[in-house]
Amino acid sequence: MKILKNGTIIDGSGKTRTKADILLEGQKITDIGNFPSVDAEEIDCTNLCIIPGIVDIHSHSDLESLQHRSEKIKQGVTSEVVGNCGFSLFPSKPNLKNMLPAFEIFDTDPTQKWDDADAYFSDLDSKKSYTNIASLTGQGTLRAFVKGAKSGAMDPQETINACKILAKCLEQGSVGISTGLNEVPSAYADLEELITLAEIVHEKGGLYTSHLRDYKFRFLEAVEEALEIGRRTGIPVQLSHLQAVGQKNWHKIDLVLELIEKAELEGVDVAMDAYPYLAGSCKLTQSLPGWSLEGGTVELIRRLNNPEMRKRIAEDTEEDRSNTWKDVVVSNVSMEREMIGKNIQEIADIC
């Protein structure tokens, strides 16, 4: 038996925090109260808070969970949902990151691959992650696996292959599918392609979670697209990090909430999550037009080295921008690290 002594308990119910002791036997709490004398191993929690484990429903710790990293558990997070925003570590193949720009966030070895969910979960078990992990299957990763970085609709055979692989991943424990519809190749999928995949997920009891196609000028249309998938398939819909990007679009939040309430009245099972702060985090490539990313990072660099292409990319980027470049701050780069902490306007002035 163990006792957590003199801690401040915050139980998540909204009740006022209280100071108390907690008795533990095995993996269970057996009593809560004041126990001045008890035969148990004592853990001194003076000046510490005791809380239920936090569930981080929108995490990108897919790779870190395989590295026995302790940052999350030290912040009270005991369970995480990974595979968000259209990219997961499975199904993958060597050099997938060259086809999927968003995949570079994981900093994986180019030779690494996880053919399916089972391969990833087996790796998790052997590496003994500190947190419990539930993983979505990334629709962008899935699409790159069967079609590469090409634009356009999946052909009939590619669709069959994608559905088979998705069904297998769900049977192996994936909890649903995620999209990252303002990142390629996820963005190349149209509504009908997404519905085809969502139907497979719904049959297996999973959910559809979406990094929407747009959070700026086409925010309302992007939300409506996700809700339509819920209407037509019956699948539960999770709207990821719901936000209106750019001051010109802030007023749209009220309109979006009206759309969501209307969908709920129609029977759509819809929920949302949001940042607890005023900044978002993404790769800088999300600022670029989708066509410039077709073919992956190698093709993007080739286009940027072409003066005419670079001019067109700059013009299209400006046309779709909702914030000033002073609002975009570099938080991490592998080279020229002196740029970390500077905004894009400052970097442009330096260059």
Predicted regions span which residues?
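N-terminal metal-binding scaffold of metallo-dependent hydrolase/deaminase domains
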Residues: 1-37
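Hydrophobic, small-residue-rich alpha-helical packing segments that form membrane-like cores
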Residues: 85-94, 106-225, 229-232
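Divalent metal-coordination and catalytic microenvironments
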Residues: 7, 22, 27, 47, ...
